[in-house]
Amino acid sequence: MEIPDFSSMKLDSRPELIDFEGVSMTRYFTDNWEKVKNFQARPDDILIATYPKAGTTWVSYILDLLYFGNESPERQTSQPIYMRVPFLEMCFQGLPLGTELADTLPTSPRPIKTHLPVQLVPKSFWEQNSKVVYVARNAKDNAVSYFHFDRMNMGQPEPGDWNTFLQKFMDGRNVFGPWYDHVNGYWKKKQTYSNILYMFYEDMVEDTGREVARLCSFLGLSTSATERERITKGVQFDVMKQNKMTNYSTLPVMDFKISPFMRKGKVGDWRNHFTVAQNEQFDEVYKQKMKNTTVKFRTEI
Ligand SMILES: Nc1ncnc2c1ncn2[C@@H]1O[C@H](COP(=O)(O)OS(=O)(=O)O)[C@@H](OP(=O)(O)O)[C@H]1O
């Protein structure tokens, strides 16, 4: 199988931020809304839900290897991860629609990616009791990663300078809305919907093997310890960064000269970006926005 050629994918200009059902979005994630809203999930679908830049690609790749690594190894060299794990709401000129990719995915189960906040997830996922793997990342590193992503990705709104972006992040004026509502929304959902595994990026960095084992247990997979070890090695940052199928280098709308998709993969990189004043302001806003939640993030590991 040939690697798909997306060199014709071009964006004339960066998209504007729009208000969509109370959430900041761009048309690239809302233009296909009727089909997204009415998407028919299946009971064995696995929805990988994240706020952008929280570790989506990492978990997507782990899931793909767990289910299909041995069964169809050719997938690993012929299909970029974003084709194997469709991005449900994606609607870019020159790329297949996320809903179409998902509908035509030949695999079972179907791993499907979304950044939608919990209230916008198509209701069929809940009705079908599909499994949901949510990955959350601490707000400060998430903001830094998102800033660099917006700089290099012509499919995202212009981020401005770091200070401008950080103010927008604290106000929730990013694509897919406020980080705070996103992480809290899925955390709350977990209290009434038991088929969610809530994972943390920091835990994955600390001990990837342990988190792969947690995933297997949630998914009901009896993957051997040797196999899990092999997968754990294959999904390390440096390995994924070199792998064309997982590093997004096949998408022409991203300018790696500005910043690579696989940028640093670290916990605590925010310290290289936040000034003391920005950090104090951020902590104040964080305390306010997170005062009614029990979800706890670790920033020191
Ligand atoms: N294997 C591994 N180990 C550690 N970190 C990893 C790994 N794979 C991806 N990443 C880091 O995750 C960030 C990208 O997040 P997403 O995949 O969620 O991006 S996206 O929302 O799908 O565009 C981005 O974070 P930053 O490096 O901090 O920018 C990636 O480098």
Swiss-Prot record:
It holds the Pfam family Sulfotransfer_1. It is an enzyme of class 2 (transferase). Inhibited by Co(2+), Zn(2+), Cd(2+) and Pb(2+) ions. Inactivated by Hg(2+) and Cu(2+) ions. InterPro entries: P-loop_NTPase, Sulfotransferase_dom. Expressed in liver. Keywords: Catecholamine metabolism, Cytoplasm, Lipid metabolism, Steroid metabolism, Transferase. PANTHER family: SULFOTRANSFERASE SULT. This is Cytosolic sulfotransferase 2. It comes from Danio rerio. The lineage of its organism: Eukaryota, Metazoa, Chordata, Craniata, Vertebrata.
